Amino acid sequence: MAQADPADRDRLIVALDVPSVDAANAMIEKLGDSVGFYKIGYQLAYAGGLPLVEKLARAGKKVFVDLKLHDIGNTVARGVESLNSLGATFLTVHAYPQTMKAAVAARGDSGLKILAVTVLTSYDDSDLADAGYRFGVRDLVEARARQALAIGVDGLVCSPEEAANLRGIVGPDMALVTPGIRPAGAAAGDQKRIMTPARAIAAGASHLVVGRPVMEAADPKQAAEAIVAEIAQAT
């Protein structure tokens, strides 16, 4: 396969949802230059994976630290400062005003971009009702997106189904990072609001988070390259 355009390659974020640093390093080695952007979430971070952020950054890779910070402002700010020092590119916080304000202030004018999580892509209207909300996913996502834009957050994490509507709300410059991406024929897993890579890009997503379709593929590098090719065709 021809070498991918780095701009297209970096729109794919591979989720390193593995239980150990050794497993993460093995997958990174398999993927080689086919992937330029990785996500480290709870599982790997709590298994000693945070130093991998700095290692990947030194190797010229981008890293999305998906810890969904949500605490009092001072605690959030200190966490942002620590993660920024490791060289992270993206960091998630929950889309509550105090949390977002603290994260944006602590980020300053560094290269770290703060992403606000609107509503988890595993949630639907019935889940919100169970949690006591009196309105649905769409209304909550829109309200939180407008708050995030006003506060100065750099991007949103949203389902691909919401990307087109949110792009109209936040404009062309804000990052829209979408999990719930499944190539045609892939199992949905625990995601309820999913879309193929090409459709998500066409809908307005700036970056696609893909885990199992790459991590569990017989040939992970080939799977990643196929997704990047689909991104390039949709751009």
From Swiss-Prot:
Subunit structure: Homodimer.
Organism: Rhodopseudomonas palustris (strain BisB5)
Record field: catalytic activity: orotidine 5'-phosphate + H(+) = UMP + CO2
Coiled coil: none
Protein name per Swiss-Prot or TrEMBL: Orotidine 5'-phosphate decarboxylase
GO BP annotation list: 'de novo' pyrimidine nucleobase biosynthetic process; 'de novo' UMP biosynthetic process
EC number: 4.1.1.23
GO cellular component: cytosol
Family: Belongs to the OMP decarboxylase family. Type 1 subfamily.
Binding site for substrate: 17, 39, 66-75, 121, 182, 191, 211-212
Residues annotated as the enzyme's active site: 68
